A protein has these predicted regions:
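Catalytic-domain carbohydrate-binding cleft regions of carbohydrate-active enzymes
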Residues: 1, 5-291
Length: 291
């Protein structure tokens, strides 16, 4: 999205860069593209993060520390391992609350806030929002009974909540902004904190000092269209896999050629090729949920 803004809205992009430098606009997500989290290979996922972080460093002089995927249709057991090995500390989504049926006991997700353990035993913090698509009314959130009840479910007495316009894009609605502002000034039983997407994770580092955090060791699955989208548009998935294999072969050949003093490693060419098809690993593209 930032690359598109850079190309088509250069004036607004420069204004945004100024806000980032002033600490008024915060980056999140770490990746080049808001990827699907099940079809792409591990190599694709790691390169997606690498390219995203390179872009953040080059354009803004900062890096992201989290995986931010509010709208994907399930999350594989490898994701905490990949994120941890990329130096990331947390992951958030809200999509699992859109499930039709409970899957983790009586709940649609294992917990609201805790640790998610990957296949190699490494862990990141998992924060799951609730009530997919919910918007706040123009009221004092510090008095919100639902927030109070949800926070009470966790050992940290905390709830993580997105706010904004959602699928149709754009900034938070005026009513949502006013509700947060009233909550920040409010004196109710709920303390409202306006924070970046990764602040929660940073506040509880190192995680080993918080044995009260629940641990989930497994996949985060999605029903509704989250099942069919991994079999639909099979040709697109075939081309994606062919691109991944070609990217791996090109990397090996290029490195070997440089080792043998036969050619200079074409780093920018390889990166641009990966960007072109990682762009199509977007969670509403590769999954076949868009035209």
């Amino acid at each position: 999205e930032m690359c598109i803004r850079d190309r088509y809205y250069p004036a607004q992009y420069e204004e945004m860069k100024k806000y980032i430098g002033e600490g008024r606009w915060h980056i999140s997500g770490s990746s080049w593209d808001a990827t699907d989290a099940l079809v792409p290979s591990t190599e694709s996922f790691i390169r997606n993060i690498m390219l995203g972080q390179q872009y953040y460093r080059q354009e803004f002089g900062v890096e992201s520390t989290d995986i931010f995927l509010p709208d994907c249709f399930g999350f594989g057991w490898t994701l905490p391992t990949i994120a941890s090995h990329c130096g990331l500390i947390g992951f958030s989504s809200q999509k699992l609350d859109w499930r039709v049926h409970p899957f983790y006991g009586k709940s649609k997700h294992p917990f609201t806030i805790g640790l998610w353990k990957g296949i190699d035993g490494s862990s990141i913090m998992l924060a799951h929002g609730y009530d997919y698509g919910r918007r706040w009314n123009d009221e004092d959130l510090s008095e919100n009974e639902q927030l109070k009840e949800l926070a009470g479910r966790t050992p940290l007495n905390t709830v993580y909540r997105y706010y904004g316009t959602g699928d149709i894009g754009g900034s938070p609605t005026l009513a949502s902004v006013r509700s947060v502002e009233k909550g920040l000034r409010g004196n109710g039983p709920v303390e409202i904190v306006s924070a970046t997407s990764d602040q929660l994770y940073k506040d509880y580092l190192p995680y080993k000092n918080h044995p009260e955090l629940p641990v989930f060791d497994g996949e985060l699955l999605m029903d509704v269209h989250g099942t069919g989208c991994y079999t639909s548009q099979a040709t697109m998935k075939l081309y994606n896999r062919q691109n991944e294999l070609l990217g791996d072969a090109a990397e090996r050949a290029a490195v070997t050629a440089e080792w043998l003093n036969q050619a200079k490693y074409p780093g920018s060419t390889i990166n641009e090729a990966w960007k072109r098809f990682i762009y199509h690993q977007f969670h509403d593209d590769l999954t076949g949920t868009s035209i």
